[in-house]
């Protein structure tokens, strides 16, 4: 096994995290996969359970331990000491989970790690492993919009000085905000790897989570032992949760092209996923549709 006992997922969200968690649970011995932890440990039924959830999220398994709320604020203003304090509190919880489960590898599968907690964890741990879990950006945007999520609950605005990709967001459509978040998270992964302290890293594509060869290659790059991987199916999908199916339509492609016009060419060159990327192919199978590339 790799020297890193702690592996974290860098992901925009709505990208197959539940599916990945199940793959890890089934096929990586000695691994404790945690999906958007810590989750409130609820014991009460019905409406009492809802009240219990609010109480525990406020006072026990808090938004800050999850990576929301004050963590986002601290990241935006560069309060590294606070971020490290929260990360160390999380580490105490994580080590208890490892001890109880008998596992020796903690695999964090959460969109929240790269929203600010990554700064604290990278200071609190000498070495970590990183997995980039990345989905088609337009499908990712569409999936978030179908959920009618509050963007600011889980994200800084593009204007925040703590961002790698800083853009004026005053006239951005909701879809453009999610496209910005996709790009920002992609860049943060690369920044973390370049900064050192990363013992191993790998990438998985959401669309290939049902491809055992692809998944096993990434697990191997992370230095993990695993059993033969078999597809587990798609979990936590929009349709399964009663939302609209995620489809790339003309409006989604138009939103993508508007956003692309905002990107400096120097930034686009840093995002290798977008090299030759053409969301228009998903509309009619037409491979001749243009993808707008900024000129400056």
Which residues fall in each region the model found?
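PAPS-dependent sulfotransferase catalytic domain
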Residues: 85-95, 142-217
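PAPS-dependent sulfotransferase catalytic core
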Residues: 1-89, 283, 288-296
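PAPS/PAP-binding and catalytic site of the sulfotransferase fold
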Residues: 16-29, 119-125, 145, 200-227
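Hydrophobic/aromatic beta-strand patches that form the interior of the parallel beta-sheet core
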Residues: 7, 32, 129-131, 202-204
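PAPS-dependent sulfotransferases, especially Golgi type II membrane carbohydrate sulfotransferases
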Residues: 1-7, 174-178, 186, 190-201, ...
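Short beta->alpha connector loops
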Residues: 110-115, 209, 237-241
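Conserved phosphate-donor/acceptor-positioning beta-strand/loop module used by diverse small-molecule
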Residues: 110-112, 124-147
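Glycine-rich phosphate-binding loop used to anchor ATP phosphates in small-molecule kinases
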Residues: 85-117
